[in-house]
C-alpha cells in the first residue's frame, strides 16, 4: 500500500461506531431495561451471533431469509447465518435444556442482530434488540403479562400513555376469518398474512389487486363477526383487551391489520406504535408462538414474547425528548498546579476511589485554567486543585463547576459531600 492509499475510517455501511457519549446514552437505556425486567423476575441470557442457516429457513419470514440475512459457507462447508433475530435461538436453547431448566422460563436478552437491508431512519444492518420471552404457560394470562411488561418498560423510560399506542390482534382470529372467506389451506393463509402485513405500504387498489378478484377480504369477516368461529375468536380478543384496561393499560386498541411478519406466530400479536406524527412507526412488537420448539423434536413448548430494537427505541425517545444525556466518566477532577503535585494528587485520588468515587487525576503539564476547561468539557461536576498547600494542610477546596460555588472541606469529608 503506497503512502497515498489509506484505509477508510468509515464503518461498514449500515452499522455504527459507538463513541463514549453515544454508548453512555445507550447503556443507560439498557440499565433501565434490565432493572424493569428483573423487577418481573426475568433472567438475562445470551448466545453466539452465529447460527446454522437452517434455523431461520424453517419459520422466519421468507423475505428476511431470502433477501436480508448475512449467510455464508464456513471453511467446513457449513451454511452459517449471522442471526437476524433472537427468537429462534431462544427456542433452540429452550429445546436443548428442556429437562434441566425450571419452567415457566422467564428470560430476556439484548443481543446484536444483523439484516442486510437499505439503511434508513429506524433501520440499520446491525442493531441491538431486546427480547423478552415467557415459556411454559399456554394460558392467555401469560400473554397479558407480556403486554403489561412492555407497557411498564415504556413508562420506565419516561413515556406517557399518550405517547404510544398498543395495537393488538390475533393470528387465530385471522385464521378463522380466512377460513370463513375461502382461504382453505395454510399456504393461502400465509400468503394473505404477508399481504396484510404490507397493507399500510399499498394503495387500496394495489391491495385489492394483490388479493385477487375472486377473493373476499377476511378483514370484512372480522368486522361483521357473522361467522361463529370468527365471532368466538373476536370475543376472546375483546375480553383480553378489557382485562388489560382493568389493569390500567388504557392505550390498548384492537387492530385486525396487525399480523407481525414472522411465520411462527400462533395467537395474540401486538405492536407498540409511536403516536407522534414526526415518528409514525412501530417501536416494538411480539406475540404468542407455541410451535417453534417442536422443530427440534419433542412436545411443543408454549411461548409468548416481544422485541424492541434500539434504533427505533432511541428514535422514539429522541422524538419525545426522553433520551438520556451522556454521563460523565468521573465524579471529581483533581487538578495539579505543577507537575510535582501529580504524585500526591494521585494518592488523594486513590483515597477517594476507595470510598466509591470515580476520579480523574490530571497527568499533564496543562495550567489549572485549562484543566478546569477539560473537566467542564467532560461534564465532570466537581473540581479540586491539589497542590503543596492542600497536601500539607489536609484541607481542599471543592468547586462545583456549573455554579462556580466553592466549599472548603477536610480530605476525609470530600467523599460524603460529592456523593
Predicted stretch roles:
Residues 2-251, 256-264, 271-279, 291-297, ...:
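Extended, charged alpha-beta segments that form solvent-exposed binding/catalytic grooves
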Residues 1-3, 24, 80, 236, ...:
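NTP/phosphate- and nucleic-acid-binding module
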